[in-house]
């Protein structure tokens, strides 16, 4: 028997405080960001059940754009309706946007961000520990049958060894889940969905129906409002500053990239780098690398690097505006067209996805995706570990196999020590995340001061 979820599951102010605290911890790319929400929303506050969380994540993994921000919008919508989704999604990117905006200005002025980079270099090992904990916990709760363990391992190997396209990995996992539903439905039987840890039931249990009834009329309204919000700033810039201005070009270009970022930011960054450097000459190859480093060491989605690209491009070609006004406009417009589509995708699709949770065939396909997501997060964790602990990596290839390996001689002793300390604080001392992040950030900064 299902129950009806209320419009506001928790007080709105309490939700805003929680999303603000989560937004300050969104380091380490999607793996780290999903880990933060998993720990905060599912395990600590118990606002949402594990299966419900996985269901939302599965849908977000199918969409273009930053899946972690989309997950925040989805859960915010479940907890507090449309305003909850708007607040959760906005706060998720706001700290990173402001931080990268400030660092972009610092870079333009002094061409140096050494101290800031060192500060965040201490955070990276802490995020590695948090991600490791998330992989273990999500695996324990999601891989309820040896078959799904095999799916997770296969997804990891497909990405790590074969470089398989992310959409194909997800599609195969969904097909496996659907096939299991047809041939061996007993494999899909689940527990109570409360995490199996003996704690209290979540405020949004796994069998609760959302109060919003999907309809084509409401979908049409959402689509109309979303498209106007998305494209109105681009049209205004084109009208006021000209269709050949750098701002119109950036608005159109980054609106397009927002629709093709399947499988995470890395899947589209090569295309962005090529066009931004070679076609538009907004920045140099070295500056693209520096922007990526800054985006990796600030909170928020990695695709935020496009803000840095737009900032430099508009600063150097501001048209009728001053360089600083142009840089600010370019950065804000690019951020807008990159993240507004995420709200549209969630508000448009979530009501329908919620009603499909009790469709056994679709639920089975999403269960297969859940297993694959464990492998995806593990692969992201491996990538993050290699680039946190080592300065350089190389690609080892043999026949169809290809894997990125670290160069042992480039290991960072400081990063290794901070990682061990972070693992101890996470698994042994079980300290809160903010404390771990703060201590590791100070350790990273101390290394620069000592040198």
Show which residues each predicted segment covers.
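Conserved beta-loop-alpha segment that forms the PLP phosphate-binding cup at the N-terminus of a helix
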Residues: 70
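Multi-pass membrane proteins that catalyze or facilitate reactions on polyprenyl-/lipid-phosphate substrates
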Residues: 1-63, 74-298, 302-451
